[in-house]
Amino acid sequence: MAAAAAAAVGGQQPSQPELPAPGLALDKAATAAHLKAALSRPDNRAGAEELQALLERVLSAERPLAAAAGGEDAAAAGGGGGPGAAEEEALEWCKCLLAGGGGYDEFCAAVRAYDPAALCGLVWTANFVAYRCRTCGISPCMSLCAECFHQGDHTGHDFNMFRSQAGGACDCGDSNVMRESGFCKRHQIKSSSNIPCVPKDLLMMSEFVLPRFIFCLIQYLREGYNEPAADGPSEKDLNKVLQLLEPQISFLEDLTKMGGAMRSVLTQVLTNQQNYKDLTSGLGENACVKKSHEKYLIALKSSGLTYPEDKLVYGVQEPSAGTSSLAVQGFIGATGTLGQVDSSDEDDQDGSQGLGKRKRVKLSSGTKDQSIMDVLKHKSFLEELLFWTIKYEFPQKMVTFLLNMLPDQEYKVAFTKTFVQHYAFIMKTLKKSHESDTMSNRIVHISVQLFSNEELARQVTEECQLLDIMVTVLLYMMESCLIKSELQDEENSLHVVVNCGEALLKNNTYWPLVSDFINILSHQSVAKRFLEDHGLLVTWMNFVSFFQGMNLNKRELNEHVEFESQTYYAAFAAELEACAQPMWGLLSHCKVRETQEYTRNVVRYCLEALQDWFDAINFVDEPAPNQVTFHLPLHRYYAMFLSKAVKCQELDLDSVLPDQEMLMKLMIHPLQIQASLAEIHSNMWVRNGLQIKGQAMTYVQSHFCNSMIDPDIYLLQVCASRLDPDYFISSVFERFKVVDLLTMASQHQNTVLDAEHERSMLEGALTFLVILLSLRLHLGMSDDEILRAEMVAQLCMNDRTHSSLLDLIPENPNPKSGIIPGSYSFESVLSAVADFKAPVFEPGGSMQQGMYTPKAEVWDQEFDPVMVILRTVYRRDVQSAMDRYTAFLKQSGKFPGNPWPPYKKRTSLHPSYKGLMRLLHCKTLHIVLFTLLYKILMDHQNLSEHVLCMVLYLIELGLENSAEEESDEEASVGGPERCHDSWFPGSNLVSNMRHFINYVRVRVPETAPEVKRDSPASTSSDNLGSLQNSGTAQVFSLVAERRKKFQEIINRSSSEANQVVRPKTSSKWSAPGSAPQLTTAILEIKESILSLLIKLHHKLSGKQNSYYPPWLDDIEILIQPEIPKYSHGDGITAVERILLKAASQSRMNKRIIEEICRKVTPPVPPKKVTAAEKKTLDKEERRQKARERQQKLLAEFASRQKSFMETAMDVDSPENDIPMEITTAEPQVSEAVYDCVICGQSGPSSEDRPTGLVVLLQASSVLGQCRDNVEPKKLPISEEEQIYPWDTCAAVHDVRLSLLQRYFKDSSCLLAVSIGWEGGVYVQTCGHTLHIDCHKSYMESLRNDQVLQGFSVDKGEFTCPLCRQFANSVLPCYPGSNVENNPWQRPSNKSIQDLIKEVEELQGRPGAFPSETNLSKEMESVMKDIKNTTQKKYRDYSKTPGSPDNDFLFMYSVARTNLELELIHRGGNLCSGGASTAGKRSCLNQLFHVLALHMRLYSIDSEYNPWRKLTQLEEMNPQLGYEEQQPEVPILYHDVTSLLLIQILMMPQPLRKDHFTCIVKVLFTLLYTQALAALSVKCSEEDRSAWKHAGALKKSTCDAEKSYEVLLSFVISELFKGKLYHEEGTQECAMVNPIAWSPESMEKCLQDFCLPFLRITSLLQHHLFGEDLPSCQEEEEFSVLASCLGLLPTFYQTEHPFISASCLDWPVPAFDIITQWCFEIKSFTERHAEQGKALLIQESKWKLPHLLQLPENYNTIFQYYHRKTCSVCTKVPKDPAVCLVCGTFVCLKGLCCKQQSYCECVLHSQNCGAGTGIFLLINASVIIIIRGHRFCLWGSVYLDAHGEEDRDLRRGKPLYICKERYKVLEQQWISHTFDHINKRWGPHYNGL
C-alpha cells in the first residue's frame, strides 16, 4: 500500500502538470470516479500523475496562506472568495476524492463498518466530566467517559466522578491501564475477530490523497509561523493562523473518528519516512516547496536547535547499551564549579523584573548533554506535526487530533517516541510561554496517555533513553534559576540553590515534567532501570541538591521586615513535587529483600551528595545562628531509604550508616529546624512577619509532614541511637538556647535568650525530647498501626468528616502506595476507632455534616498526646484534644478534675534502634531532670506545669525502658563520697533516682540571694574535694562537654585537624556588656530524684505527708503495676505512678521511698502576707465585687430579654413554642402598653408618639404553588417529563379572573375575587415594638455606620435592635384598647334584622381621613411600603390603569394573603387549635387597622354594595336581562371570603363582635347556596332529577329552609330555567364522577366546600377579638368552627348526626333570595352555558404547597441537566441551575439569557416566586436562595454515604438525597424564614 502511494507521490513532477479539462473540474464526483478507476488498473502510473497534478492545483498552499500571513491585506490577496472560499473548495475536493466519486457520508459509514472498536479512546478537553474507578484501575490515572462508565458494572466499587483539569481520554478497553472486568459492554468483546477485512479499493484514494493533504497542512503551519519579536510571542498572530486552519484540522479529526480502518491509513501516512522526504525536502523545482523548507529551517534554528544533515549525532538515534549516555560526565563537579555570572541568559525573559537583587548563577561545567538538549531531526510528517504543535503552544484542536489517533497501537508507539524525542524542546517552549498554565495542561493531557501504560513506558525507556532525557531536561530547566546559597558561610559558599522567586518555581511551570517523571517511576520496570543506573542516580542527587537549603530565612532582630515574601509556597511545593514525590515513587519499588541493592545505591549517592553539600557550604561544627531553611531533601532521601532498608529489606542499619563525624553533621540541620519551630512559636521570629509562621505550619501540615518533619525526626532518632547520648542531649539544650536556665540557682543570666522566651523554649526542648523518644512511626510500627495512630490523633482534636479525615491523614504521596483513600484498611480502621454521628440540622439553622467521633475505649486507651502535638498545625488543637479528653473523663466518671495528658505505652522498638533508649539513661539527662524538679519545687521563675509534665513523662519513659532489674548487691550507700567524676554514680535511671546529691556549686549573679548565705559549716574537705572535681562550675558545662567530644572525633581525622576553627559567628553571642558579675556559690541540696518526687506530691496535693506508699497495704500492686486507677489523672497521679514503677523495679528504691515517707516533715509555718500578696488579695476582693455587680445587671437585663428569648428560640418552625406576647398589659388595664426596645420606655401608643411593630414585608408566591394533589410534582429528569403549571392555585385564580373580566363589568370583577396568590404581600414580625421616632434615629445611625452590613439601609432594611431579626418596616400600633378587653365584644340581644341595618348604615358612613397626626402619616407611609413590596404586575389587574378599584382589591387581598398563609403554617386546618406561636407573633390586628383606615377612604356606592344583594329582595325585572353592555358579576360567582374581608374592612374600627357574627351569618347563606349549585353541576342528569323531586316533596315542612334536600331541589329547579344544564353532551357525562351520591357523601361534599371559608373566618375572629381557637378531631372541624363562629344555634342537639344546613340563618325568606340570586345567572347562562358552569364550580380544596420531589440519587439529576442546552443560545451553560419550585432550567450568571441587565436566575425568582428563588446549582450540588436583592448559599440536600456535602462535586462520590434537610428547606420556604435563619447574605447586583 505504502509503496504505491510513495510511487505516486515521489519522482520529479512535470513542471507544467496537465490539468483536467475544465468540464471535469466542475463535476468533482465524476473526476473522482474517473481517477479511482484509473488508479485501480494494474498500471496506474498515468492515473497517479493525473491525481498528483489535480492535488498540486487544489492543495496549493500559496493562495490561502498569502492571506493568512498577510494580515490586513488578506482579503485583497485571497482573490475573489477570500481565503475561506479556496480552502472550502480544497476540502470539498478532498472529500470527493476520498469517496472516489460516491457520496462522502456513505463513504464514512462504509469505513466505520470496518472499525474493530476494541478501545474507546474518546478524547476530552478540560472541564469534561469523567469517571475514575480505583477498583478497576491498574494505573492511578485511569479514566472513563460517562458513557463507558455507565455501561460497565461498577456497583460497590470505589469510584468517583471528576471534572477533568487538563483533559484526558477514555481508557475503556485498554487492559494495560484497567482490569477487563470494568470494560463496558461495547469494549468487552474483542470484536476484531469478526470484523471483515477492509476491501482494497475502499481506502485506496485515501492513501493517495492524505499525504498531500497533510503536507499542505504542514506548509500552512510553516508559512504562518513568524518568529516572535523581542517583546514576546504575538499569540494573536499564531491564533489567527490556527483559526484559518480550523476546517483542515477538523477534517482530520473527523477522519480519526471513522474508526480503526481509517486510523491505520493515517498512521501509515504520518509515519512513512519516504513520503515525508520526497514531499518536504525542498529539493525539487517547486519554488513554493523550497520557500517552505527554508522557513522550516529558520524555525528550527530560532528554537536553538541544530539540524544535523543526516549524520548520526551524539548517538541519539542509536542509544548505546549499558550505562546511560550521560554517564557521569560533567555532573559531579557541577555543584562545585561556578561559572561567570551571566545576565544575558537566553531563557531569562523576566530577569529584569525585581529579581535583579540576587544574581543568577550559570554553571560553567557541561551539564548540557548536547544530543538531548539541542538536536532535532524530523523524518516523518508525525514528527514535524508535533514540532509545530509545540511551536504553536499546543493548540487544542491539534492536541485532540493527535490523541484521537492513539487507539492505533502502531501510531501510539511512534507518537510516544516522537514525543520523547521532542521532550527537551517542549521544556524550552514551556519556559518561554506566557500561557504556561494552559500549555502545561495540554502537555499533561498528552503525556498522561502515553506514560501511564507500563509496557509503552518500558519500551521507550529502553529504546529512547527516556529516563536520561527526563532527568537531563529537569536538571537543565532548574539550572536557569540558580543563585548562590547563603546558608552557613555567606562569603565562601560554593553551593547553589534554586531561587524560589523565579517565575519557573512561583508559577509551578515545572509541574508537567515532574508529573511525567513521577508517572514513569510508578512502573516497576522503569524504576528498576533508574535505581540500577549509577550515572542517573548521581545526576538525580545533583538535581535534588539544587533544592537543599533553598528559601533560607534569616531572623530579623531589629526592624520588622519590610516586604513579606511569599516565596515559601513555591519552595514547599517544589520540594514536595520535584523531590519528595519521585522519592516516594522509588521507595514503592524497594519493598522486598531482593531490592537491597537499589537502596544501597541510593544511600551511597545520597551520602556523597551530602558530603559535597557540607563541603560546599563550608560547614564545620556549628550551624550559623539565626538562620533556618525548612528544605533538606537530601537528608530526607537518606532518612526514608534508611527506614525502608530496615523495615522492608532486612538490611543491617550499621552497614548503611556513615562514620560518627558525618552523623554529627547530619543531625545539625534537622535539629536546627526543630529548635526554630520552638522559636517561631515563642514569637522570636515575629519581625519576619506572618510568612515564617506559615512555613512552620506547612512543615507539619498533613500533606507535607510525612515528607518533611517525619523523616527529619527519624534521622535525628537514628543519629541519637548511634551518637554519644550525653553529647546528643547537650546538643539539644544548646540548640534550644536553654543551657543557662538549667542551674540550681534561683537567678541566672541567659546570654542568648530573652527571659520572656525562656519558658516556651524550655517547653519546646523537652517536648522535642519526648517526641524523639516516644515516636515509633519509623521505628517498628506496622502500616496499620501507623494509620490507626494518625486517625486517633486527628479524631481526638475534633470530630471529623470522612473527607477531612482522608485529607488530614498523611497519605503516602505516591498514588501507588498501599494505603489509599477509601481503601479497605482505611475503612476498617475507621470503624474500629470511631462512631458515626449522622448529619443533623441544628435549631440555629446551621447544618451539621456526618461526623466521626472517637469511641470511648479510644479515649480510654489510645489517646496519645505526643502524636497530637506532632500533628497539630495550630496550637489550639492540642488544647481542644485535652478539653475533649477532660470531658470524656468527667462524663465516664473516670476522673473529676483537670487531667494531665495520659502516659501511653509505646510499641516495641525495632532492634536496630535500641540505642535510642540510651538517651534516657545518660547522666546529662538525669542532671537536667533533677535540676528541673528542684527548680519547680523551689518555685523558680519561668517554669510551668507543662515543663513538669514533660519532665515526669521523660522519667516515666526512662523507667519503662530501663535495663534489666539491677542486682540488689549493688552498693548504694556512701555513693556521694566515692563518686568523684560526676553527679551520678552510673547511667541507669532506676538507680540514679535514689542517689542523693548534697551540695552543688553554682555560678550566680552577685545580686542573687544564694551569695549572702554562709557556706555550710559541716563541709568536710573530702566533700569539697568531690565538689571541685565534679565539673559543676555551672550545673555541668554542657557546652564544654560537647565541644570536647566533637574535638576528639575531628582530631581523629588528622587531615582536617588544622581546619578546625571556632566559627566566626560565635562573637555575636557574647553576653550584653551591662551584665552583673558572676560569682560562685555553694548550695546545700540533700535531695534525690525520689525525694523530690515525694515532696512534689505534697506540693501538688497541698497537704503534708500526702504520699503513702500503696504497696504497704497491698503488696500485689508491685507485681502488677498497670492499674487502671493510675491511667488517667493529674500530676498527683503521675507522681504516684512513677513512684510505684520505681519501687517495682528495684527493692532499694522501694526501701528508700518508705524511708523518706517515714521522716515526718515538719509542719510549714503560716505564711506572712507580704505587700505584694496583699495587693493580690485586694485585687481578688475588687474582682469579686465587680462580679456581683455584673450579676445584678445581667439579671435585670435578662428579665428584659426574656420575651425576646422566647421568640428567638423559634424562628424556623412556627409551632412548638412558648407563646410570645406582643403586649405586656396587665389584665385590668384597658389600654395596651408597649415597650420600646430602643429607649426602653413603656407606654401606650399615641397619635403624637406612635409605637410600631418591627415587621418584615415580603412578596410571596407560596400560596400560588398550592395544588389539589397531595403528592408533590417530580423534578423532570428526561426530555419526556415536563411540568405544566396549569393546575396551580395561582393559574386557576388567574383563569377565573380573566373569565370574569371577559363578560362582566371590570369594577365589579375586582370585588368578586382576591389576588395575591402570586406576589401577595406577607407581613411577619419578631414581636418587638419601638417608638417610630426612635426607629428613625436608629436608621440614621445605621446609615452612618460604615460596617459592611448584609442588608441595604437605603431600602429601609434593618435588624431588630433586640433580637437582630431582619426587618424592613414598622407597622404602627393603633391607639386604643387591648384586644382581649374589647368592650365591643360583649354579646347583645339584638335581632339579626336590626344588626343587618346597623351594618349597612355603618358601611354607608364615609370614612373621613383622620387629621394630620404622626400616626396617620406613619399609617400612610407603611401602606406605601406594603404597595412597593410587590411588583406592579402583581397588584394591577384592572383594565383601566390606576383605577381605585385596583387599590381596593389589593388592600383586602393583603389581609387574605396573610390569613391564608397563617392557615398553611398551621398545617392547612385548625384542628390543633390554640394560639400557636404563629398566632401570638402575628401582626394581623395592627395590619387590619392600617388596611381598614385606607379602605374606608373608598366608599362603595350603596347601589353596588353587595350587602344589599345579600340581605334585601329587589324588584326583579325580567326585561332587564342584558340591556346594559356588561352586567355586574352575579353574586353566586363572588368569592365569599373576599366578600367577608370587604364587609369587615368597610366597617369603622374597632369592630363589634355582634356585627362580625351578623356578617358571617349572612355570608354563610350565600356560601351554602354556592355549594348546592356547585354540587348540582357536578352530578349527573338522573341524580339531578331525582333530587329535584325528592326535595320538592319536603318543601312545605317547617324547617325547609334548613334542609339541604329542599334547598338543593329548589336551586336545581331555579338554575334549570337558564340553559345551565342543557349543554351536557355525552363526553361531559363520562367525566362526571360515577359515585353514587348518598346523604353522607353529599353532606361531606357540602362541608368540604364551606370549610375553607370557616377556617379563614375563625382565624380572623381569633385575631380581631383575641378568642382562642378550640382544638378538635379532623372530622368534627366543621361543627366546632361553626359553633365557635356563632353559626350554630345554642340549643343545637349534638347527639343527632351533624347537618351543615342547620347552621343557616336566612335574613330574608330563603326561597325568595335564592330565586333572586339564580336569576342573575340565568340571563348569563342562556348565552354562555359552558362558562357559566365553570364559574360555579370553585375549586377550594387546595393542598399544602410543596417543592418538587427530587430523585434519590444526585447522578440522575446531574447526567440530565449538566449536558442540557440553554433554550436561548442552544449552548450548554457554564453554570446550569434548576428552580426547585417549578422545575425551570436556568443559566446562572449566563449572559445569553440576560434581559435589561437582569440575569436569568434573578429574573426567574421575580416571575416564579415574586423575588424568592430556590435554585439547585447542577455543577455544585448546592442550593442557592435569592431573596429580593440579596442571595445566599443554603447548603446541599444531597449528601454522600458518610453524610457529607460535596460542594462543587470536588470529590465526585455518589450523593443521595437527605430527606430531613429537604424538609427543612421546604419548611423555610413555606414559613418565609430564609431571611432569619440563613446568616450569610450578600447583594447579587442582578448578576445571578
Swiss-Prot record:
<dbReference type="GO" id="GO:0071596">
    <property type="term" value="P:ubiquitin-dependent protein catabolic process via the N-end rule pathway"/>
</dbReference>
<feature type="region of interest" description="Disordered">
    <location>
        <begin position="1008"/>
        <end position="1028"/>
    </location>
</feature>
<protein>
    <recommendedName>
        <fullName>E3 ubiquitin-protein ligase UBR3</fullName>
        <ecNumber>2.3.2.27</ecNumber>
    </recommendedName>
</protein>
<dbReference type="Pfam" id="PF18995">
    <property type="entry name" value="PRT6_C"/>
</dbReference>
<comment type="subunit">
    <text>Interacts with UBE2A and UBE2B.</text>
</comment>
<dbReference type="GO" id="GO:0001701">
    <property type="term" value="P:in utero embryonic development"/>
</dbReference>
<keyword id="KW-0833">Ubl conjugation pathway</keyword>
<feature type="compositionally biased region" description="Polar residues">
    <location>
        <begin position="1016"/>
        <end position="1028"/>
    </location>
</feature>
<dbReference type="GO" id="GO:0008270">
    <property type="term" value="F:zinc ion binding"/>
</dbReference>
<dbReference type="GO" id="GO:0007608">
    <property type="term" value="P:sensory perception of smell"/>
</dbReference>
<keyword id="KW-0175">Coiled coil</keyword>
<dbReference type="InterPro" id="IPR003126">
    <property type="entry name" value="Znf_UBR"/>
</dbReference>
<dbReference type="GO" id="GO:0016567">
    <property type="term" value="P:protein ubiquitination"/>
</dbReference>
<dbReference type="Pfam" id="PF02207">
    <property type="entry name" value="zf-UBR"/>
</dbReference>
<dbReference type="GO" id="GO:0001967">
    <property type="term" value="P:suckling behavior"/>
</dbReference>
<keyword id="KW-1133">Transmembrane helix</keyword>
<keyword id="KW-0479">Metal-binding</keyword>
<dbReference type="InterPro" id="IPR039164">
    <property type="entry name" value="UBR1-like"/>
</dbReference>
<keyword id="KW-0808">Transferase</keyword>
<dbReference type="GO" id="GO:0000151">
    <property type="term" value="C:ubiquitin ligase complex"/>
</dbReference>
<feature type="transmembrane region" description="Helical">
    <location>
        <begin position="1806"/>
        <end position="1826"/>
    </location>
</feature>
<feature type="region of interest" description="Disordered">
    <location>
        <begin position="339"/>
        <end position="362"/>
    </location>
</feature>
<feature type="compositionally biased region" description="Basic and acidic residues">
    <location>
        <begin position="1170"/>
        <end position="1186"/>
    </location>
</feature>
<dbReference type="GO" id="GO:0004842">
    <property type="term" value="F:ubiquitin-protein transferase activity"/>
</dbReference>
<feature type="transmembrane region" description="Helical">
    <location>
        <begin position="919"/>
        <end position="939"/>
    </location>
</feature>
<comment type="similarity">
    <text>Belongs to the E3 ubiquitin-protein ligase UBR1-like family.</text>
</comment>
<keyword id="KW-0863">Zinc-finger</keyword>
<dbReference type="GO" id="GO:0016020">
    <property type="term" value="C:membrane"/>
</dbReference>
<feature type="zinc finger region" description="RING-type; degenerate">
    <location>
        <begin position="1306"/>
        <end position="1364"/>
    </location>
</feature>
<feature type="modified residue" description="Phosphoserine">
    <location>
        <position position="1199"/>
    </location>
</feature>
<dbReference type="GO" id="GO:0005737">
    <property type="term" value="C:cytoplasm"/>
</dbReference>
<feature type="zinc finger region" description="UBR-type">
    <location>
        <begin position="118"/>
        <end position="189"/>
    </location>
</feature>
<comment type="pathway">
    <text>Protein modification; protein ubiquitination.</text>
</comment>
<dbReference type="GO" id="GO:1904878">
    <property type="term" value="P:negative regulation of calcium ion transmembrane transport via high voltage-gated calcium channel"/>
</dbReference>
<dbReference type="GO" id="GO:0061630">
    <property type="term" value="F:ubiquitin protein ligase activity"/>
</dbReference>
<feature type="transmembrane region" description="Helical">
    <location>
        <begin position="761"/>
        <end position="781"/>
    </location>
</feature>
<keyword id="KW-0812">Transmembrane</keyword>
<comment type="function">
    <text>E3 ubiquitin-protein ligase which is a component of the N-end rule pathway. Does not bind to proteins bearing specific N-terminal residues that are destabilizing according to the N-end rule, leading to their ubiquitination and subsequent degradation. May play a role in Shh signaling by mediating the ubiquitination of Kif7. May be important for MYH9 function in certain tissues, possibly by regulating the ubiquitination of MYH9 and consequently affecting its interaction with MYO7A.</text>
</comment>
<dbReference type="InterPro" id="IPR055194">
    <property type="entry name" value="UBR1-like_winged-helix"/>
</dbReference>
<dbReference type="GO" id="GO:0006511">
    <property type="term" value="P:ubiquitin-dependent protein catabolic process"/>
</dbReference>
<dbReference type="Pfam" id="PF22960">
    <property type="entry name" value="UBR1-like_wing"/>
</dbReference>
<feature type="region of interest" description="Disordered">
    <location>
        <begin position="1"/>
        <end position="24"/>
    </location>
</feature>
